[in-house]
Design a protein with these regions (language model features):
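Bacterial N-terminal signal peptides that target proteins for export
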Residues: 2-13
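N-proximal helix/coil linker or "cap" segments that precede and/or mark the start of modular domains
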Residues: 3, 18, 22-39, 177
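A short beta-strand-turn-helix
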Residues: 37-61
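Conserved redox-active cysteine motifs that mediate thiol-disulfide chemistry
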Residues: 65-82
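Thiol-based oxidoreductase modules, predominantly thioredoxin-like and allied folds used
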Residues: 92-105, 119-126
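Short, internal strand/loop/helix patches
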Residues: 109-146
């Protein structure tokens, strides 16, 4: 009986330790963004096969987790593409990095063939990065300052959200100058 109690206790301790370690690496507002390195699904301007968040250090990043089966995700993509292009043309150090989480990469690619974007789109069909970022639903986005700090977490997307996101990007741009 004592052996079973010790075995059970050791399992509980291991499970608790694993839970705590996951929480230590969760992405929260006010903390440094977790780096990622994922394969490209599409990007005309990139020649690399994988892209890391750290490759864009010094830029404000809109990190967006999306899936082809998510209606709000599909609404956000062209809006964020237009915003990215407009802000970059004004000289803002801003980039959108989207992470597609479809288990079948072809689903994300099909959407992008139909509605191409100019920003970086990565793929994570195993869902490891969304798990590290504690994503609960789609879309979920993070606004990351030029210093690499998560300034905002946003769940869902409505067309009216774009103005609020842009206002926050402009605020971060002013702070980083």
């Amino acid at each position: 009986m004592q052996f079973l109690s010790q075995k059970l206790l050791s399992r509980v301790i291991v499970i608790m330790a694993m839970s705590c370690s996951t929480l230590l690496f969760a992405a929260e507002v006010g903390e440094s963004a977790l780096d990622l390195s994922l394969p490209l699904i599409v990007n005309q301007a990139q020649n690399a096969e994988t892209v890391s968040l750290s490759d864009h250090q010094g830029k404000i990043i809109y990190l967006d987790f999306w899936a082809s089966w998510c209606p709000p995700c599909l609404v956000s993509m062209p809006i964020m593409n237009e915003m990215r292009n407009r802000l970059q043309s004004q000289g803002l150090p801003f980039e959108v990095i989207a992470v597609n989480v479809d288990s079948d990469v072809e689903d994300g690619m099909d959407f992008l063939l139909d509605k191409p974007v100019d920003f970086i789109v990565l793929t994570d069909p195993q869902g490891e990065t969304p798990a590290r970022y504690k994503i609960k639903g789609m879309p979920t986005s993070f606004l990351i300052s030029a210093a690499g700090v998560i300034e905002m977490k946003h769940e869902g997307f409505k067309q009216s959200d774009a103005a609020m996101i842009e206002k926050e990007i402009l605020r971060l741009s002013e702070l980083s100058q």
